[in-house]
Amino acid sequence: MNINFTLISQAMAFAIFIWFTVRFVWPPLMRAIENRQKTIAEGLAAGERGKRELELASQRSGDVVREAKQRASDIIAQAEKRAAEIVDEAKVAAREEGDRILVGAKAEVEQEVFRAKEVLRQQVAGLALAGAAKILRREVDEKAHAELLASLKAEL
């Protein structure tokens, strides 16, 4: 009888222990396990989101770098084009300035030639007058014969 009573009392104590455990101990343990599972799941999800965001950020940074390189090459191309335009404009301006200086120099040379011819005409007229005076053996009055001298200058 002792074994039976002991066995039954042990079974009842075990049943009370199970009831107590299921009633008071098991729910907090399950809540703790579920909270831990939820925390772990959220951590894994956050890790995945972080991974995706890192990939997107990496892709965006690559796009930004490519765009910056493209803009830089465009700016360099525009600068080179503008430099070529400035050089061409300078060449045109220099050519125009050279032409203007050449025209001025030609005009100045023509004026000098005209002045030299005028001086030569006067000298030739003077020589002709001197020659005529020697031929006639008399002095020709320059004032009296100014009209004759002017016509001689015009012919020369």
UniProtKB/Swiss-Prot annotation:
SUPFAM superfamilies cross-referenced by the UniProt entry: F1F0 ATP synthase subunit B, membrane domain (SSF81573)
Keywords of this entry: ATP synthesis, Cell inner membrane, Cell membrane, CF(0), Hydrogen ion transport, Ion transport, Membrane, Transmembrane, Transmembrane helix, Transport
Cited Gene3D superfamilies: F1F0 ATP synthase subunit B, membrane domain (1.20.5.620)
GO molecular function (one): proton-transporting ATP synthase activity, rotational mechanism
Subcellular location(s) of the protein: Cell inner membrane
Its membrane topology: Single-pass membrane protein
This protein's GO CC annotations: plasma membrane; proton-transporting ATP synthase complex
Membrane-spanning segments: 5-27
UniProt function note: F(1)F(0) ATP synthase produces ATP from ADP in the presence of a proton or sodium gradient. F-type ATPases consist of two structural domains, F(1) containing the extramembraneous catalytic core and F(0) containing the membrane proton channel, linked together by a central stalk and a peripheral stalk. During catalysis, ATP synthesis in the catalytic domain of F(1) is coupled via a rotary mechanism of the central stalk subunits to proton translocation.
Record note on quaternary structure: F-type ATPases have 2 components, F(1) - the catalytic core - and F(0) - the membrane proton channel. F(1) has five subunits: alpha(3), beta(3), gamma(1), delta(1), epsilon(1). F(0) has three main subunits: a(1), b(2) and c(10-14). The alpha and beta chains form an alternating ring which encloses part of the gamma chain. F(1) is attached to F(0) by a central stalk formed by the gamma and epsilon chains, while a peripheral stalk is formed by the delta and b chains.
Family, as annotated: Belongs to the ATPase B chain family.
Annotated protein name in UniProt: ATP synthase subunit b 1
Source organism (scientific name): Nitrosospira multiformis (strain ATCC 25196 / NCIMB 11849 / C 71)
Lineage of the species this protein comes from: Bacteria, Pseudomonadati, Pseudomonadota, Betaproteobacteria, Nitrosomonadales
Name of the gene: atpF1
